[in-house]
């Protein structure tokens, strides 16, 4: 960890705890800052705040009192999930207090070079693929960021022989100033998190912050399957390295079933350890990064062939009497489910879909679900999903919850079929998050096997 003194004896407010806020508070305290933590959860229900208080860090819980900002803070570090419309943040900005996320802190102290990965879909899988390939090549890829390990925590233990492989959300990237990865990846850009950003253009601008400090000596890996992303290529100082499954590019690309990097075959597409056209894109992004880091083709091929996926992202769960179960609970939008289905023969798929009703119809999904063996539909959005199934001519049954849906899907499947949980909806109508939903699917599959 780099020892820096820019926060020494400076008053810093950490707004919001969770993993990233807790890590930021401890780091700032270690760097000599005078830290105050403010979290909305009551103290008695807030183990993180209790621990920080025991460590001598000032905590204010149970709300966000605006008068707290009457103190002269030099900096605010906010939890990424707290929107900039929050009154505390608005007041801080009005007073000229810089507002950062802990990703910026991680950059400032990191001795390790940083590879940053952002995008709408595929971030976690691509981040994990890159980390595993670099580690296999002896470059020790340390996963951090939005993938579940606070970047500022991992940066404290990283040496210059490691590589920080950071998954970065738009929320995190809104709060960076000096952040400067040596390689950045944008997997794709789709309209999402508009409730947070207000406009798609604002969401894209937040993602684009990843390259703000990059120079021609740095590499920006972009998905040229998308015209929007391709158009952005002319707006960066970084050296652009494209990847595409649709055209031959000066980077990583798919041609005749083979994955190439600048004219050289790296591996066959069907050798990737996880199915789906989206995973071909993820693999191409990984290949581009790996080749920029001088990883040999054999190491890339062996690692991506053995790659088992990421939990809740088209994760193979089990095989029961010839029926394979896949957990794709992370597919919380139509595009993600479309990509999941692209990896299978529809006639052998029983799809479990439905969840939180956000008011959108599923007409875009009709071509992708046409020809499915059956569907099991559940959740608030069930009526809308059923309308799409009717248009596609797919028979369906309804379920009360994930356990019920999994059992019914298994009853409808026969040897050689696939039961695919890929809801195309968020989980919040029934479950706290997509992880809980996916875990219940996994647990039910285990019960069916007993």
From Swiss-Prot:
Catalysis: reaction(s): UDP-N-acetyl-alpha-D-muramoyl-L-alanine + D-glutamate + ATP = UDP-N-acetyl-alpha-D-muramoyl-L-alanyl-D-glutamate + ADP + phosphate + H(+)
Localization (cell): Cytoplasm
Keywords: ATP-binding, Cell cycle, Cell division, Cell shape, Cell wall biogenesis/degradation, Cytoplasm, Ligase, Nucleotide-binding, Peptidoglycan synthesis
EC number: 6.3.2.9
Chief place where the protein resides: cytoplasm
GO molecular function, one term: ATP binding
This protein's GO CC annotations: cytoplasm
Signal peptide span: none
Residues holding ATP: 119-125
Pfam family, one: MurD-like_N
Record's keyword annotation contains NAD: no
GO biological processes: cell division; cell wall organization; peptidoglycan biosynthetic process; regulation of cell shape
Listed pathway(s): Cell wall biogenesis; peptidoglycan biosynthesis
Role played: Cell wall formation. Catalyzes the addition of glutamate to the nucleotide precursor UDP-N-acetylmuramoyl-L-alanine (UMA).
HAMAP family, alphabetized: MurD
Stated family: Belongs to the MurCDEF family.
NCBIfam families noted in UniProt: murD (TIGR01087)
Protein name according to UniProt: UDP-N-acetylmuramoylalanine--D-glutamate ligase
Species name: Streptococcus pneumoniae (strain JJA)
Organism lineage string: Bacteria, Bacillati, Bacillota, Bacilli, Lactobacillales
């Amino acid at each position: 960890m780099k020892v820096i003194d820019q926060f020494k004896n400076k008053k810093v407010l950490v707004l919001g705890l969770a993993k990233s806020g807790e890590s930021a508070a401890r780091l700032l305290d270690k760097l000599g800052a005078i830290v105050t933590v403010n979290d909305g959860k009551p103290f008695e229900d807030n183990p993180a705040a209790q621990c920080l208080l025991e460590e001598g860090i000032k905590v204010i819980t149970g709300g966000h009192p605006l008068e707290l900002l009457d103190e002269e803070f030099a900096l605010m570090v906010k939890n990424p999930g707290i929107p900039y419309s929050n009154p505390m943040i608005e007041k801080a900005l009005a007073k000229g207090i810089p507002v950062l996320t802990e990703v910026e802190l991680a950059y400032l102290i990191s001795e390790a070079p940083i590879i940053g990965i952002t995008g709408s879909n595929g971030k976690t899988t691509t981040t994990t693929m890159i980390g595993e390939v670099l580690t296999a090549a002896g470059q020790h890829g340390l996963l951090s960021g939005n993938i579940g390990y606070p970047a500022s925590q991992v940066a404290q233990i990283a040496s210059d022989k490691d590589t920080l492989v950071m998954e970065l959300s738009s929320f995190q990237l809104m709060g960076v100033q000096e952040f400067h990865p040596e390689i950045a990846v944008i997997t794709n850009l789709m309209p999402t998190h508009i409730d947070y950003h207000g406009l798609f253009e604002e969401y894209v601008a937040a993602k684009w912050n990843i390259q703000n400090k990059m120079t021609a000596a740095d590499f920006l890996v972009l998905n040229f399957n998308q015209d929007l992303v391709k158009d952005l290529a002319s707006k960066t100082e970084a050296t652009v390295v494209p990847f595409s499954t649709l055209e031959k590019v000066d980077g990583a690309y798919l041609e005749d079933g083979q994955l190439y990097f600048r004219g050289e075959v790296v591996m066959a597409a069907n050798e990737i350890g996880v199915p789906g056209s989206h995973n071909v894109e993820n693999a191409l992004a990984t290949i581009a990064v790996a080749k920029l880091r001088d990883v040999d083709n054999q190491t890339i091929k062996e690692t991506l062939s053995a790659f088992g996926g990421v939990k809740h992202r088209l994760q193979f769960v089990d095989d029961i009497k010839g029926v394979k179960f896949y957990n794709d609970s992370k597919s919380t939008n139509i595009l993600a489910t479309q990509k999941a289905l692209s990896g299978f023969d529809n006639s052998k798929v029983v799809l479990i879909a439905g969840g939180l009703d956000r008011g959108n119809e599923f007409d875009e999904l009709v071509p992708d679900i046409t020809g499915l063996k059956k569907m099991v539909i559940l959740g608030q959005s069930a009526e809308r999903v059923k309308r799409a199934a009717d248009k596609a001519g797919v028979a369906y049954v309804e379920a009360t919850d994930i356990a019920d849906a999994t059992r019914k899907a298994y009853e409808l499947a026969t040897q050689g079929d696939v039961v695919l949980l890929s809801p195309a909806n968020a989980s919040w109508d029934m479950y706290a998050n997509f992880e809980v939903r996916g875990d219940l699917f996994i647990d039910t599959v285990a019960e069916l096997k007993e």
